[in-house]
Structures are given as C-alpha cells and as structure tokens.
Amino acid sequence: MPPRDAVPTSTQVSGIGADGVQTEKVLKNRPKASALRQQKLPAWQPILTATTVIPTVFVIGAIFLPIGVFLFIASDAVSEFTVEYTNCLSPCQLQINLPNAFDGDVFLYYNLENYYQNHRRYVKSRNDQQYLGDLTNVKDCAPFDIDPATKKPIAPCGAIANSIFNDTFTLAHRADTGIVTMVPVTTQGVIWNVDKDRKFKNPPLNDGNLCDAFNNTTKPPNWSKNPCEVGGFENVDFIVWMRTAALPYFKKLWRIVDRTTNPLFSNGLPQGTYILTVENNYPVQSFGGKKEFVISTTSWAGGKNSFLGIAYLVVGSLAIVLGVVFIVIHMKFGHSMNELSNVSEIHH
C-alpha cells in the first residue's frame, strides 16, 4: 500500500452530459491526504484541576510580587524635579530649590502635554530620504514641501520638521554667597547612535560651506534661522524632535549635565538654589497644551515611572488572592482525589 502522501492530487469523476454522452471531469485541486493538510495532527489539551491551577496561580504571584517591588524601589530612587513655565513671559526666570543632591548623571528634559504627535497625517508628513542629504526629495511632505513664493524645496520638509520645539534653556547654580555658576551641559549621549549614523546626514559640502549646500532650498515657515546655521539635518534638537511620541503627554531629552568641566558638578547637581532662564518661544495655548522643564536622574530601570512596578504588584497580589480563593472553594466544594479515582473506576 503506498504512503498516504502518495495519493494522487487529481481525481476523475464520471457523469452524463446534456447530449447523453458520458464525460469525465478531472478534479485537480484535491489536497494531499497528509495529517497536516487534513487537519488531523495530534493535539493535547491540559486538564485544569485544582492541583495544577492553584500552584500555578501562586507561582505567578510569587514571581510578579518581587519584580514589582524591585521596579518600584528603582523608580522611587530616581530624583526628579519638574517646573511648569507655560505662561511665563519670555525671557522667563524661575527659581528652583533642589531639596537634595542629584548624584550621578543628570538629564534635562522638556515636557509637552496635550500635544498629539501621533496624528496620522502629522506622522506621515516627512521624507527620510531628504534627511539623508537628498535636498530635492520632498515627497509626502505636503503642505510643507515647496515654498509658494520661491518655488524652492523646503529643507527640512514636512509638518514634523516645521513644528520643531524651539524653546531654549539655561540653568545656573546660585551659592549661599551669591555666586552664580552656569551649569555646563552637553549634547553627547542625547541622540541614539542609529539616528546619528544612519538616519540623518547633511548633503555634500561645497568648499566646506554648509549654507552653500542648502543654497537652492528654503527654510520651513516656522523656523527663525536657516538650517545651515544650526547644523542642518544633524542638529541634535532636530533629530530628537523627529522621533515622534506615541502619547499626547511626552518627555524629550534636551541636554545632559557635563560633569567633566567644573568640579562643582563632578558628582551631579548639588543641593541648593538654581535659576532657570527660558526663552519661551513655542506656542501651546491654542491647543490647551502645557510645557514643563524636568531635571532627573536615572536608575537601572530607566527614569522615574512607578506605573510598571505598581502594575506588577497589582497582578502579583491578585494572583495570590485568587490562589487563596481557589483553595477555599476547593476545600468547601471540591472533590478529593479518592472520589475522583472512584468515579473513574465506575465509568471504566
């Protein structure tokens, strides 16, 4: 007998046509008689009993609870200070009193609230080929593709680039003696290596002049400076802004405190008074937005965010509670193993 997979894939079916002549119709699409094609593969379905479910629930709780504790402790160890400056008149000066020292690497962020960078038309309004140096490629950038007045391509093009965040910050430490020291900051480590190395490149330079390379383009309408004056496509703030956020409340890294240039900040930011000066240029009132400046450290789990730790604690606690409930139900209404074995013998 031939193997099952060797069954022919075509079958002849006999019949009588309208003219009374016997005809044969060949069926060519018959699947092979294999277990996979005939959906006859062996299957296994676990039998859920009290002796398997209850230990499993307790194991889940025992795993999730310590993970939640570690995540919550890591988040709680992060030092963070937030100051809102939405309605502060530019130039705006705000006094910040750090209650404790921010040890280690200190990161400076800006927060935006009620800003939907995830809007479909907004996210698609960009051209990654242009950001690699192809200045004339403005596909998908409408309405910020061609300047109506000069008929030149806009570079960088697109709605995301046109709406770049342009507030500027300076942070200074004021000692008890009244001496004011500027906090040194750096852009090293602000952007991802994949963005810097593969996604954003300036066009080839003409005689080493970036402005000559951008000569046949025009700046986005909302930009106050020409791109060549701020580093072109390789501008750090531009690259950070182009990585769009998924939620309407987001935080983007602005700078990192430079711990190598001044001994006062070698261990981070010392406790004390700071003066934050803001050039408040970015309008958010039209859509009910809010702007904040954030000073933060990090831990092995990232920045300050207790949600993940709380989520693990809640799931772990629910698993333990459900395990106890299942034990009570099993002891009160369940059957013993002897009873189950007797029932099995009766049926056999």
Curated annotation (Swiss-Prot):
Q: By its UniProt entry, which Pfam families does this protein fall under? A: CDC50 (PF03381)
- What is the originating organism of this protein? Caenorhabditis elegans
Protein name as catalogued: CDC50 family protein chat-1
What topology does it adopt in the membrane?
Answer: Multi-pass membrane protein
The record's similarity note reads:
Belongs to the CDC50/LEM3 family.
Tell where it localizes. Cell membrane; Early endosome membrane; Recycling endosome membrane; Endoplasmic reticulum
Q: Which residues form the signal peptide?
A: none
- Disulfide-bonded cysteines: none
- Which residue ranges traverse the bilayer? 53-73, 309-329
Give the source lineage, highest ranks first: Eukaryota, Metazoa, Ecdysozoa, Nematoda, Chromadorea
